[in-house]
Amino acid sequence: MGLGRKFVLGAVLVVTGLALSAGGCALQRLPNVSAEVTGPPASPPVLAAFQSDPAIQSLSDWQDRRAPLLKARFQSEIYGAMPATVGYEIISRYVLEKPEKGAIGTIERLTIALKTAEAGPWTGGRPVVDLILMTPKGKGPFPVIAGGTFCGNDALLPKQTGTRTTTMALPPECGGGAPGFLVTAIFGKYANAPPWETLAQRGYALASWHPGDVVPDVAEVAEPYLAALTPIGTLPEQRTGAIAAWAWTSSRILDVLGDDPRLDARRMLLWGHSRHGKAALLSAAFDPRPAAVWALQSGTAGAALGRDDVGEPVADITRAFPHWFAPSYASYAAKQADLDIDQHQLIALLAPRPVLIGTGRRDQWGDPHGSFRALKGADPVYQLFGQQAFTQTKLRHPDGKGVLAFYMRPGLHGIHTEDWTEALSFFDRTVPKAVPNTPNSGLKP
């Protein structure tokens, strides 16, 4: 066998292996998921008595009693303590590109130092994040879609060469050549970069960063970074997990975006795929500023109910990714039904803001049914806020009603044209925005 064929075969084997482990998935189960809703309702009922707190009777009961209790419980049992909010400093800012053609106005790179309560193992003692910000042509302030990238901003900006736009080592699958091409082929056209031009045409700005700049996504490496972000006095079993650290990073990025007069601080939208979908939901649960959230295939400890027998068990995810969570979460590996909180309660903490949950029909490991029932389980809190009831009955396309929505497109774990089509339609419907700059700004397959 020639060297070229050996290289391609090796790349195929590498990426096939990645397909079996992407997004926190230990396996990819291939049968199609039924579009008919199955499984029991989310438990415990979101307004029922919880621990020593009596049943919720009013919106003030939820806001004053239940929401703080749930936030404390999610930190102690699943995600770990949220890091303290200190501030940020923009170290540098410069324009990468100002295209003459198309709807994109400016693409900028910002180097941002995040201030932390304690110095850590980062170079200079504090995390430094490279932020790419695209603003469209036209008159602002613009709504901005903000989310992390798996492979850093070099993958987001394929035309840019030279200085790496991330301070941490990237996994090998993020390299160029055949492996990088196959990652995109398997995980979707937009696995590395969102549809820039389409977002600009629709009037949205885009903000992207690499969460691994704050906590690297490697269990053996992450611990000292997590220790530095964990608030002093936190119990060891409640040590900050990487999901919480990445959620905190999202909020710090919103600090930066909210101070930019070209952007509308009332229309900052968070999104994330897989582990970053978990972080987007958690960030918005603790931060009231995201106007809407899109979580794509966020799975266990994301949108999927933890008590389901379908999907990724706590035992598997905490064994494969122990750094993502508080150490206490692993104690439920053999008894996950004993955990008294579940993900419908996390989604309820986002009320009354719009939430879109996306899944793939062959991503059974991500538990589409459990994610749908989690939305249904959060709905009573949304109704407390006066929002329209969640009326969707099938795991297909959103019914166009209310601010809770779910879709299931064909395929596996990845980011595809259908995902961005659903997300932009949802944002257009639920978050007021300016008239699009140009007509016919739909996505091309």
What is each of the regions a protein language model found here?
Residues 2-11:
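Bacterial N-terminal signal peptides that target proteins for export
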Residues 10-21:
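Bacterial N-terminal signal peptides
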Residues 24-130, 138-139, 158-163, 440:
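N-terminal targeting or regulatory segments adjacent to alpha/beta-hydrolase or S9 domains
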Residues 252-312, 316, 335-336:
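Primarily recognizes the serine-hydrolase "nucleophile elbow" in alpha/beta-hydrolase
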